[in-house]
UniProtKB/Swiss-Prot annotation:
Gene name as annotated: pyrC
Function per UniProt: Catalyzes the reversible cyclization of carbamoyl aspartate to dihydroorotate.
Cofactor list: Zn(2+)
Family: Belongs to the metallo-dependent hydrolases superfamily. DHOase family. Class I DHOase subfamily.
Protein name per the record: Dihydroorotase
Biological source species: Listeria welshimeri serovar 6b (strain ATCC 35897 / DSM 20650 / CCUG 15529 / CIP 8149 / NCTC 11857 / SLCC 5334 / V8)
InterPro entries named in the record: Amidohydro-rel, DHOase, DHOase/Allantoinase_Hydrolase, Dihydroorotase_CS, Metal-dep_hydrolase_composite, Metal_Hydrolase
Length: 426
C-alpha cells in the first residue's frame, strides 16, 4: 500500500487540483484532499503531477533474436523510466510470433522478466512479409493484442483484405506499417531537399499514402478496425481524415520525432537520423500537428526502435532504420509543445493515456477511484539534458542527444507496484 502525498492531479477541465492518492491491492483506492493511514508507505509527491501511466502501442523489444539491441527486461525498464505502464511489443523478432507455440513462449518470457505490462502483437503473415496468413484464432487464444507485420507493408491487397476479414470476425485490429515496396526506390531518407543535397536516394510520400488509401477501402469492405502506424505525410493525414468522415473504422498514431523534427533538422549523413518513416518536409510536419489537434490522428506512440551502436554509427546508406523513444517522449513533447503553449497539459496526457486505451478498448489510461493503479509521477519543474549514457535501454540511438528538456517522470507504478523511482540504480 502506498499513499502519494501532496501531489496534483488533472481534472476533466484540465485544471490542477491538490490531492493525495491511496494505492491498495493494485487499485486506486481513494483520491482525496488529505489521506492519513497508519500503515503502508508514504510517497512524497509534493508539487508533482500524479497522472495515469502512459500507454505505448508501438515498441520494439527485439527479444527473442535481437538481444544485442534490447531485451524484454531492458526495454521494460526503459518504459518504466519513461512513465509507461503498458506497452505493445512488435513482432519483428526471431522467431516471429506467427504461431500459438511461439506466442506462448513469448508470453512466458514476458511474465518472467517484464517490469511493466507488455501486450504482444502477432504477425499478420508467417515470418513477416509473406502472403501466407497466420492462424488468427489460435493466436488470439494465445493472447495476441492485435495483428501487424510492422516493419513491412502487406503488399498484396487480397492478402490484406482476407486478414482484415479474419481480424474483424474476432473483433481484433489490423495494425499497419504502410509502405508500398514498389515505391520505396531503395530510399534511406525522405525524398526532399536533404536527399537532394546529400545525393541520397529518397522515399517519396506516396510510398506511405498510397497503401493507406488502399487499406482504408479494404477496412470499410471488411468491417475491420484498421490502425495506421507512425503516420508521416500530409497526404496520409488527408486520407485518414476523409476515411473517418466516411465512417470507416480507422485510427492513427504519430511518433514524437515526426512532430518535433523535419528533414531540415538533419545535420548531415549521420545514421542516428535514419528512421522509417523518415523525417519529412515542413509541410508534412505541419499537417501532422494539425491532424493531431483536430482528431484525425488519435494519439502518440514512440516506435521505440533500439539498435546496437555499430548499426547506427555509420552513414545512412549502411545504418539500420529507427531511434529509441521510451525514455524521452514525455520530456521532449512537454518541452516543445506544452511549455510553448501550443498544447495543453491535458491534451498531451490524454494522447499518451486515455486515447490509445479507448482506441484499443484497454481498461487503462485513467486515474480514478477503482481503476488499476498504473501511475506516473511527473516533476514538471525538473530540467535535464538527454544523455544516452543514462538510458536504461540498451539502445542509445537518438538524434536528441544534448537537448535540455523540462518535465520528467520521477516514479512509475504498475498495478500498485513501484517499478521506477528517480535516483535508484538501474
Amino acid at each position: 500500500m502506498y499513499v502519494l502525498k501532496n501531489g496534483q492531479i488533472l481534472n476533466e477541465s484540465g485544471e490542477l487540483e491538490n490531492k493525495d492518492v491511496l494505492i491498495q491491492n493494485g487499485k486506486v483506492n481513494l483520491i482525496a484532499d488529505s489521506i492519513e493511514v497508519t500503515s503502508g508507505e508514504e510517497f512524497d509527491a509534493t508539487g508533482k503531477l500524479i497522472a495515469p501511466g502512459f500507454i505505448d502501442v508501438h515498441v520494439h523489444l527485439r527479444e527473442p533474436g535481437g538481444e544485442h539491441k534490447e531485451t524484454i527486461l531492458t526495454g521494460t525498464k526503459a518504459a518504466a523510466r519513461g512513465g509507461y505502464t503498458t506497452i505493445c511489443s512488435m513482432p519483428n523478432t526471431k522467431p516471429v510470433p506467427d504461431s500459438k507455440e511461439v506466442m506462448e513462449r513469448l508470453q512466458a518470457k514476458i511474465k518472467e522478466t517484464a517490469e511493466v505490462r507488455v501486450l504482444p502483437y502477432a504477425s499478420i503473415t508467417t515470418s513477416l512479409g509473406t502472403d501466407e496468413l497466420v492462424d488468427f484464432e489460435a493466436l488470439k487464444e494465445a493472447g495476441a493484442f492485435a495483428f501487424t507485420d510492422d516493419g513491412v507493408g502487406v503488399q498484396l491487397a487480397g492478402t490484406m483484405y482476407e486478414a482484415m476479414k479474419r481480424a474483424a470476425a474476432l473483433d481484433m485490429a489490423i495494425v499497419a506499417h504502410c509502405e508500398d515496396n514498389s515505391l520505396i526506390y531503395g530510399g534511406v531518407v525522405h525524398d526532399g531537399i536533404f536527399a537532394e543535397r546529400e545525393g541520397l536516394k529518397g522515399i517519396p510520400n506516396i510510398a506511405e499514402s498510397v497503401q493507406i488509401a488502399r487499406d482504408v477501402l479494404l477496412a470499410e469492405a471488411a468491417g475491420c478496425h484498421y490502425h495506421v502506424c507512425h503516420i508521416s505525410t500530409k497526404e496520409s493525414v488527408r486520407v485518414v481524415r476523409d476515411a473517418k468522415r466516411a465512417g470507416i473504422r480507422v485510427t492513427a498514431e504519430v511518433s514524437p520525432h515526426h512532430l518535433i523534427l523535419d528533414e531540415e533538422a538533419i545535420p548531415g549523413n549521420d545514421g542516428q537520423w535514419k528512421m522509417n518513416p523518415p523525417l519529412r518536409s515542413k509541410a508534412d510536419r505541419a499537417a501532422l500537428l494539425e491532424g493531431l489537434l483536430d482528431g484525425t490522428i488519435d494519439f502518440i506512440a514512440t516506435d521505440h526502435a533500439p539498435h546496437a551502436a555499430e548499426e547506427k554509427n555509420v552513414p545512412m546508406e549502411q545504418a539500420a532504420f529507427g531511434i529509441v523513444g521510451l525514455e524521452t517522449a514525455f520530456p521532449l513533447l512537454y518541452t516543445h509543445f506544452v511549455q510553448t503553449n501550443e498544447w495543453t497539459l491535458k491534451q498531451l496526457i490524454d494522447w499518451m493515456t486515455v486515447k490509445p486505451a479507448e482506441c484499443f478498448k484497454l481498461p487503462y489510461g485513467k486515474l480514478e477511484e477503482g481503476t488499476t493503479a498504473d501511475i506516473v509521477v511527473l516533476d514538471l519543474e525538473k530540467e535535464a539534458t538527454i544523455d544516452p549514457d543514462t538510458f536504461y535501454s540498451k539502445g542509445k540511438n537518438t538524434p536528441f542527444v544534448g537537448e535540455t528538456c523540462i518535465g520528467w517522470p520521477v516514479a512509475t507504478f504498475v498495478e500498485g507496484t513501484l517499478v521506477y523511482k528517480e535516483g535508484e540504480s538501474k
